[in-house]
């Protein structure tokens, strides 16, 4: 039997040879994200990976592809007293809204600014940059409707990738209005597309009645003439949405953020209102969006709270790391942690002394390791080199009798004898 990871899921592994799947690259991206989010005043919230399906039906939208085609549902046990259908989270926002409401975070000083990161799951058609198990960096702001906040979350994401040296990004923005002005736009779309339904795909025909905005999001019919001539939402905005839209563009300009207006961006979730945006990189081809998001001023009310504005984004970690690899941007990962000390022992008498030294080194805050395979000294030295150790402490039976050890500086290639009780202080002086 061949045992392998399910299709569309990836192992994240220790080692530069694994490219974008190198776990150290993931750690650095997470660290940079946390640092930038905290600079912006965001705090971490860790929601569960599983939520009740009802949350996504009401929050994300019953007719969205995520709910109808892509969710990994969990069938409850027959003897489960709480036998409601659950699902692995397909995105973060709905679960973070649920956590904000359930735990009374609305009682804290507002707005609430939170970040989260971790895995999410969708039954996707697997291709470059699109997986069934994927990871997101997520930020959300609850309780502020100022368009300056929309601009802030866009800037936050750009600051994260700027620290990684990533350039050549395109910020695409649009406004899809609100429940007051969207019905008029919805009707305009239906009037426009109705004569062409026989030429459009099955999904478009389904969306025509249930959610005509999603017609603009169709990939199969993207080049159809009716798509290119469709009404644009910006022509149908109410006064409030137009002021918000103009405010967003003003703030982006003030921040020096270049942007393009793309009236076909509607995003694939029903909860969006007003601002929607995507940040693109051409190296990913069809999956060129590294991250996207927008405003969802009605979502919290839909989930059961009081009317509360919200805005945020989800950034695809796999996509960011894949682009960094394709661009050859390795500098952010150059400070890969090294093993401080490898303890090489030779002979039975040296073994317990080496183990005692190993634990003393670790207690002193130095990363340290020792051979557990009974290898020769030559093989131990070779292994220490592969581990990129800074120093090797060599202990043989003669050294033990003399109360000393040989300390080899691996970068310099020098070696000297040091009393055992001075090993730690010697290594600290060498690093000073």
Swiss-Prot record:
Protein name in the entry: Histidine--tRNA ligase
Reaction(s) catalysed (UniProt annotation): tRNA(His) + L-histidine + ATP = L-histidyl-tRNA(His) + AMP + diphosphate + H(+)
CDD domains: HisRS-like_core (cd00773), HisRS_anticodon (cd00859)
Keyword Protein biosynthesis: yes
Record-level GO BP terms: histidyl-tRNA aminoacylation
Sequence similarity: Belongs to the class-II aminoacyl-tRNA synthetase family.
Protein's cellular compartments: Cytoplasm
Alphabetic keyword roster: Aminoacyl-tRNA synthetase, ATP-binding, Cytoplasm, Ligase, Nucleotide-binding, Protein biosynthesis
NCBIfam families per UniProt: hisS
EC number: 6.1.1.21
Stored HAMAP family: His_tRNA_synth
Record GO terms (molecular function): ATP binding; catalytic activity, acting on a protein; histidine-tRNA ligase activity; transferase activity
Lineage top rank: taxon: Bacteria
Organism: Symbiobacterium thermophilum (strain DSM 24528 / JCM 14929 / IAM 14863 / T)
Assembly notes: Homodimer.
